């Protein structure tokens, strides 16, 4: 009886290991921060914002054991973008959405799996019309850009790992359609910092 139980246990371990090796897809959910840098431009418009917080959902399909394609959707709330000019000073409360795709290169070291990634995407800036937006007529804006990142995944089981990553998104500074006849153009691109921490499930 003990031998049968032991053999059954070994078979279960082998099946789990085999499934882990055959896993070619994973999904992950992460908490994220959105940090937009200070921007000074030749148009005399200065832009600054607070840190926004949100979620990032990702899907990866493994092409080989060390390379994958990834699709991302992220949303961030309560990101206040401040515009300083002469003679105005106001802010726009925004909800940001990221839609992007990337090529991922993974380096396998037992349970630790560092990775790098890069690809195209869009950042959608959606103004929220409430008391935190100080100008009327701000319009939704969709800007094309590119994302990149580097991080590490730590395997906690054959099916799950913890992922930490520094991501960046390069896109044009929004002007929200120059609301209220104010010229908010900076003619600048900026690098939005986006650290994330989450859990991935392999299947």
What are these model-derived regions, one by one?
Residues 1-24:
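Cleavable N-terminal export/targeting peptides
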Residues 4-8, 146, 193:
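Alpha-helical transmembrane segments
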Residues 22, 31, 58-132, 154, ...:
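Gram-negative (and chloroplast) outer-membrane scaffold detector with strong preference
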Residues 33-56, 141-142:
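Surface-exposed strand-loop-strand hairpins of Gram-negative outer-membrane beta-barrel proteins
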Residues 39-46, 81-88, 126-135, 175-182:
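Outer-membrane beta-barrel translocator domains and adjoining extracellular loop/strand segments
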Residues 47-52, 93-98, 140-145, 187-191:
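Short sequence motifs at beta-strands and strand-loop junctions characteristic
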Residues 78-82, 157-203:
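Predominantly the C-terminal beta-signal and adjacent terminal strand-loop region
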Residues 125-168:
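A charged, solvent-exposed segment within the mature domains of Sec-exported extracytoplasmic proteins
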């Amino acid at each position: 009886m003990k031998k049968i139980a032991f053999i059954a246990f070994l078979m279960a371990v082998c099946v789990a290991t085999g499934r882990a090796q055959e896993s070619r897809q994973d999904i992950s959910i992460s908490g994220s921060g959105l940090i937009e840098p200070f921007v000074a431009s030749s148009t005399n418009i200065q832009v600054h914002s607070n840190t926004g917080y949100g979620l990032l959902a990702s899907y990866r399909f493994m092409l080989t054991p060390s390379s994958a394609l990834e699709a991302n959707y992220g949303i961030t709330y309560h990101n206040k973008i401040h515009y300083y000019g002469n003679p105005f000073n106001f802010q726009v409360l925004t909800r940001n959405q990221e839609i992007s795709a990337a090529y991922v290169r993974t380096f396998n070291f037992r349970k630790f799996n560092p990775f790098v990634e890069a690809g195209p995407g869009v950042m959608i800036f959606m103004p929220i019309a409430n008391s935190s937006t100080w100008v009327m007529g701000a319009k939704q804006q969709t800007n094309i850009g590119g994302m990149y990142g580097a991080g590490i995944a730590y395997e906690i089981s054959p099916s799950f790992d913890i992922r930490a990553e520094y991501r960046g998104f390069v896109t044009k500074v929004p002007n929200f359609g120059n609301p209220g006849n104010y010229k908010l153009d900076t003619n600048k691109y900026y690098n939005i910092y986006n650290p994330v921490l989450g859990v991935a499930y392999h299947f």
